[in-house]
């Protein structure tokens, strides 16, 4: 799923993905709506599919570790039939990002622990972002 105007660019940049699998957003309605449309589209074609939704505005400094994390997340999703959110531990309060509130540990693959998600706060105000950093 991408913005309609980027479909051709994505097709050129990722030639291994069949063009029919690159979807242009029918209408710009932000991330959650795009994720829902993409999930419905994929589910219609394969109800057992494991879906990984990735933002495109981040820098991946350790590609091998990133791939390992995504594989571990997909494994948990498949084996435990769980919805998985991958996050990083923030180093400073940021009001433009969402915060995952973690619960009990459900598994650990080497250095990658997996926790239940107690909640999620999307783009908190600065006071709350500062609280989240401390916890």
PLM feature spans:
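Proline-rich low-complexity regions
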Residues: 15, 26, 55, 90-94, ...
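Residue-level signal for inorganic ion chemistry
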Residues: 38, 57, 100
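Conserved N-terminal catalytic core of the sugar/cofactor nucleotidyltransferase
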Residues: 1-53, 61, 71
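Cofactor-binding loop segments of dinucleotide-utilizing enzymes, especially the Rossmann-like FAD-
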Residues: 3, 56, 88
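Conserved core of the sugar-phosphate nucleotidyltransferase
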Residues: 63-135
